């Protein structure tokens, strides 16, 4: 489905954001991407659909090398990739419905897009997705009037408007409170299973990642240092990904053994991971 071979990204400063990343994602597979800030997680996701141009390597989606496509062919290939952003990437002055329908722009010609003319089928799909993500009746509300959780739900529905094969999800819970974060994660994974989608989800919360995602890939300094089941994440793996630290409060939360007196320490440790 998705095959990444020797993916590298270097900047003009000489900094290397990605160092020979090799990764495969099977149809319907859900993968969590974790690592410290600056590890290359967002860069990796953006290199897949070439929002960031890779310096070297191959990115194969259903056998087609995205890294070497011309502009027109890349536009066609991007139809199959849905993107969900940390900061939602909504047009604030537009309504929820208008933001959703923008997910169909890759299938529309210039003039229909310019005049915002969409097919009855697209409009029906938009209403159905709004209902599915819990925003029924909010189609005429402006994006800037929504809460953070509601905006993320619009972003999720917009990505599904593309009818993609693959979802790239970049920090979907970073700006959300713990309850909303769990709701959003459940929603994303439920929709992936309902639509048979594969997903790469960049997420800073290790406990949330291991709770919801069966496979975890850990990046450090642009290189993959762990690729395996969430159930195998322990203090040794966390040290390999993030560096030396007392990870007991995190691993206790992952295994459900945190006692009430340890909850504050666990929260502090989680914040420390996100800040690194």
Curated annotation (Swiss-Prot):
Molecular function via GO: ABC-type phosphonate transporter activity; ATP binding; ATP hydrolysis activity
Binding site for ATP: 35-42
Domain ABC transporter: 2-246
SMART domains named among the record's database cross-references: AAA (SM00382)
Record's GO cellular component terms: plasma membrane
Biological role stated in the UniProt entry: Part of the ABC transporter complex PhnCDE involved in phosphonates import. Responsible for energy coupling to the transport system.
PANTHER family reported in the protein's UniProt record: AMINO ACID IMPORT ATP-BINDING PROTEIN (PTHR43166), PHOSPHONATES IMPORT ATP-BINDING PROTEIN PHNC (PTHR43166:SF6)
Entry-linked CDD domains: ABC_PhnC_transporter
Pfam families: ABC_tran (PF00005)
Record text on subunit structure and interactions: The complex is composed of two ATP-binding proteins (PhnC), two transmembrane proteins (PhnE) and a solute-binding protein (PhnD).
Compartments it resides in: Cell inner membrane
Enzyme Commission code: 7.3.2.2
InterPro entries, A to Z: AAA+_ATPase, ABC_transporter-like_ATP-bd, ABC_transporter-like_CS, ABC_transpr_PhnC, MetN_ABC_transporter-like, P-loop_NTPase
Gene3D superfamilies: P-loop containing nucleotide triphosphate hydrolases
Record field: catalytic activity: phosphonate(out) + ATP + H2O = phosphonate(in) + ADP + phosphate + H(+)
Primary localization: membrane
Keywords carried by this UniProt record: ATP-binding, Cell inner membrane, Cell membrane, Membrane, Nucleotide-binding, Phosphonate transport, Translocase, Transport
Organism: Alcaligenes faecalis
Protein name: Phosphonates import ATP-binding protein PhnC
Family: Belongs to the ABC transporter superfamily. Phosphonates importer (TC 3.A.1.9.1) family.
Membrane topology of the entry: Peripheral membrane protein
NCBIfam families reported in the protein's UniProt record: ABC_phnC
Organism superkingdom: Bacteria
